[in-house]
Amino acid sequence: MNKKKKPFLGMPAPLGYVPGLGRGATGFTTRSDIGPARDANDPVDDRHAPPGKRTVGDQMKKNQAADDDDEDLNDTNYDEFNGYAGSLFSSGPYEKDDEEADAIYAALDKRMDERRKERREQREKEEIEKYRMERPKIQQQFSDLKRKLAEVTEEEWLSIPEVGDARNKRQRNPRYEKLTPVPDSFFAKHLQTGENHTSVDPRQTQFGGLNTPYPGGLNTPYPGGMTPGLMTPGTGELDMRKIGQARNTLMDMRLSQVSDSVSGQTVVDPKGYLTDLNSMIPTHGGDINDIKKARLLLKSVRETNPHHPPAWIASARLEEVTGKLQVARNLIMKGTEMCPKSEDVWLEAARLQPGDTAKAVVAQAVRHLPQFVRIYIRAAELETDIRAKKRVLRKALEHVPNSVRLWKAAVELEEPEDARIMLSRAVECCPTSVELWLALARLETYENARKVLNKARENIPTDRHIWITAAKLEEANGNTQMVEKIIDRAITSLRANGVEINREQWIQDAEECDRAGSVATCQAVMRAVIGIGIEEEDRKHTWMEDADSCVAHNALECARAIYAYALQVFPSKKSVWLRAAYFGKNHGTRESLEALLQRAVAHCPKAEVLWLMGAKSKWLTGDVPAARSILALAFQANPNSEEIWLAAVKLESENDEYERARRLLAKARSSAPTARVFMKSVKLEWVQDNIRAAQDLCEEALRHYEDFPKLWMMKGQIEEQKEMMEKAREAYNQGLKKCPHSTPLWLLLSRLEEKIGQLTRTRAILEKSRLKNPKNPGLWLESVRLEYRAGLKNIANTLMAKALQECPNSGILWSEAIFLEARPQRRTKSVDALKKCEHDPHVLLAVAKLFWSQRKITKAREWFHRTVKIDSDLGDAWAFFYKFELQHGTEERQEEVRKRCESAEPRHGELWCAVSEDIANWQKKIGDILRLVAGRIKNTF
């Protein structure tokens, strides 16, 4: 090492070092260092100046920043997250530590940027590829077409004509064409000038003229001159039919020429020409570029791994989709050579090949893969003769005797006796197949079937179907007492073998037994598994749900078994007895229902509804004394029951025992004086035309129950029937003072005033009623109808709009609004109504009537069915439905609607109640009321 060399040489100078400053030297410059002088207007060349000091503009900005001491620190320039928009320290000196801090921040930013760089670049690349895929360049769109230019020969290139100056000649020299229509007189004149000239103009004979001999002279008939054409006498009109025939003839000639051509490889069939054109349309919807990419990718996979079966299958299917079936066949056959042990490749090859070739392919596959079941199944499917199928399957069973699928396919082709023999062998080869054992048991006799099932249980002790089949076998042969034992033994045996008893699966098996007609088996299964896996407090609820589910699945015997078991567990539960009674009423016989009700009232004597159901069942069958005895027993169990009193009164009045009914009502008024008892007493006297007695009873009832609106309504209606309008008005007004929220009372009073002719008073009453009962759709509807009946349709529409604003979910208002619209707007209104009230029966009924008015019979019937299904208690829906069937249905449909209505027993509906509650119709049956209401309907909507 050189000791004379100073250690600081080659090192950077310390901060603030100025050369020569320590020895007192000062720097100086000469003119050669500065350069020549510049003019003030010359551009400043400060390229080598430090940033911020290069130009005059930079100096001005610096001076301005120095002069501008107060920054913009207003609230509008402040952000909670970023602070002020500008730097608070921009006017301060930029020192070394600031530079170091900026370098650290820059390094951090660079580091963070590098961490996300790969993911960001990948995302940007995917976005660019997606954009290029959605919006490819024109160059990319025509790239596949440009590749075909390589196939153009040099002669074809040279034969392309030069464009020359004609390229833009029309644009450079515009020529304005004038098109003038030819007058009709021109065509008429030339069509009529078809005469022959019989003389020669003398001017034509000068200079030798036409008579001068001329080689092939002009007198010689000119080719085409005398043929049909210009010399043919004109007819005055064009024959378009002949023009069409000529065009067809020309097309036939061209097709014939092509079909007779032998220069090409194919010959065109004229008859199938258009069909062939349609078949040439490609069936795939992918882009041609995507197909080419997929083809290249699959080719690469095949070359990289030629023993990969999915690559060959995918390649063949790609060619098949693109319409190149022969290429697909060639590829898949090459695949069978490269992958001879792949079952999927052989099956795909058999699928792509035509019939005979496919058989050969399958035969070759069997030689390579003699143990594969699907190949044998495919071979059997390719055979058309039953004997050939049997031969193939038997050959397959020689190689694969333990295949259940092959045995099943072979047995299906045999006759019953041969199938039984084959199944005997099948269960030996496949002893764990439940299906084969059960199939053999079905074909055997009773004794042999029992032996077969016993062997099946020995081989498969964990399957429930064998036990259930054994129970069904015993039931089918009359041994019903064994069914219960077999099912109980099955539960015990399965649990002993570690099988979990799945309650849902057993219930499904019971439903299948029910549908198959094995009633005892399904009931035994239900009794055995109904209580498994259920908490004690959830039993009742779960069992009722199970019963409903069975009814929905049409497994009625299963539901009956559930109710029977539930009644044994809960004998004192009224709700269970009621559910069972309703089930028996809908799905059982009258005798079973009455027996059930007798047991029910014995366990639940306080359940009034059970007594009433029993009495009604007897009454409907015409056994009035039995109904009376049931009600007498009900009185003993429920001495002061209003329902039983009224049921007894109805029974006597319906059978014309009016004195008995009066005595019963008198006893009821003394022992159980309720408002309904008084109301029935008044109505009985009213319908018997004992007006005075009815009025006295009504006054007595009102002294006890003045807040019961139906009594006031009956009082007013009796006065109205006697034409005592003032007294009727007074009765309604008194009733409204006591019952201001009774909508029927308001309606009766308003209709009374309208009947008298006091429209102004009617409007006032309805407005007052709406104030006392806001959001009441019935009152709004009556107000709208009042204006409509008065002929003020504009006011009616205005009121309807207000009503829908106050009651936007009212079905009766929407149904009325539909038919207030003009016919073209009704459909739109009905759509709005369905959006607001999708499941309201009034809206559904209005839609059905709308379809009816448009003569869309099928749709109208569908909507009527939907209406009565949603609300079977709406009598108006049944009446309109019955009227519809009277006009457009058969007698069977009419009878069906009537019977369904009688079973539903509707009680509500505006038109229905107007007829059913009329005093003149008090003894009418449901069917009679239905006919009366339907007779009043006029389909003028």
From Swiss-Prot:
Taxonomic lineage? Eukaryota, Metazoa, Chordata, Craniata, Vertebrata
Q: Got a GO cellular component term for this one?
A: U4/U6 x U5 tri-snRNP complex
Task: Please give the superkingdom of this protein's source.
Answer: Eukaryota
Q: Record the organism.
A: Pongo abelii
An example Gene Ontology biological process: mRNA splicing, via spliceosome
Under the GO molecular function aspect, what terms does this record hold?
protein-macromolecule adaptor activity
A Pfam match is PRP1_N
Subunit details: Identified in the spliceosome B complex. Identified in the spliceosome C complex. Associates with the U5 snRNP particle. Component of the U4/U6-U5 tri-snRNP complex composed of the U4, U6 and U5 snRNAs and at least PRPF3, PRPF4, PRPF6, PRPF8, PRPF31, SNRNP200, TXNL4A, SNRNP40, DDX23, CD2BP2, PPIH, SNU13, EFTUD2, SART1 and USP39, LSm proteins LSm2-8 and Sm proteins. Interacts with ARAF1. Interacts with AR and NR3C1, but not ESR1, independently of the presence of hormones. Interacts with USH1G.
Q: Which residues carry this modification: Phosphoserine?
A: 143, 279
Q: Where is the composition biased (Acidic residues)?
A: 66-78
Output this protein's name: Pre-mRNA-processing factor 6
Query: Its principal location?
Result: nucleus
Keyword Repeat among record annotations:
yes
